């Protein structure tokens, strides 16, 4: 009997502790929601200043073991031409189970102590009425989130399948799974999204996207800019009957990486395509990478802030036209662009490639810029040579176009345009021969190992063009790039007339002098 009383006492004590902890947690949750909304609004204004979006929490009702709240996404007052009408908003209804052991988690046998477990879904209101008609009265998504005592939020979101037809258009979406992990104050963000298929049909036109996979892992760096990795993979994109073309893109990948050191930011954006078919003709695969290095972190922060400020200012414009607003934003961008040249940034295309069954073409480009001089008033009046010496530290361009590869590409392009195989091959041979001869005529390209190539390097006022070294003034003169005052020094060149005969040879009439 005594042991039973002790057991009952322990249970009552635990229940009292749980009740007290849940009640206390409920009070902490209300504070946490207010802080989270404030942080979310700060990030919305930084990332999407032109939208005027703002998040609000309304109707918070706190109980002992659970609470209710509505989150409303709306727009600021005074915003013109907003997507959301004044007074309307996208409402999310949330039911919050208090910690330390939220009932919703206990039901799933998740016994990790947490501040709260939150179940959220969209509310059917006037703003979302069209969406709920499409989803047949169901919330487009439901979200289950776990809020830790450190303030981080881990969420699992289910986006439901959607299937509807209207005005001859059929829309089918398989649904999606989203997982996110957000730290306190959104300093660290990770996100994954997976979806199987989206199909849109209209008459004989079809658009299909298969196998979407997004993975993001970012953290806020020392310059208040997110650094980290983002990757998107799409298994296949199919377009049939659109503009009488059938297009298939396979293995589409897009990735970006931003990193930082004590003073600079460094970034790389890559695109790749495993396969491209047009009218069932396989054109091959390609890659494209853009790089940036030595971008002064503080300068990038100021540049971004200037753009955001201009965008926010344009939102409340009552009297200016959209063109005037856009012009003001563009002016803000270009007026602050010079600050990005601090620390001699480097930009590049490393590489751009395209590969088919006959070979692979590559383009590599890199430029190192100089910081602008203190007196910027003379920049607009600078002659070409002075501008190059002032702005560019060094630059390189390397192009390799294997002749069999570009011949195959040109043949396929002619086949797509309706030519038969023999005529397509003849036409392609003419095009490649003309490209080669024009490149030689104007000393732009050479032929090396059966590939048309360009090798250009510039540094400190000296240039090497396809193996020939020369000074910057000589290069500008020979290639017709000098100022008008120097035109008398440039040998006159007459462009050859195009020869459309089957021989593919180029006939040069009159005096044609190649630059020497």
What spans do the regions from the language model cover?
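Glycine-rich, small/hydroxylated-residue low-complexity segments
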Residues: 8-9, 16-516
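Positively charged n-region of N-terminal signal peptides that target proteins for export
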Residues: 1-5
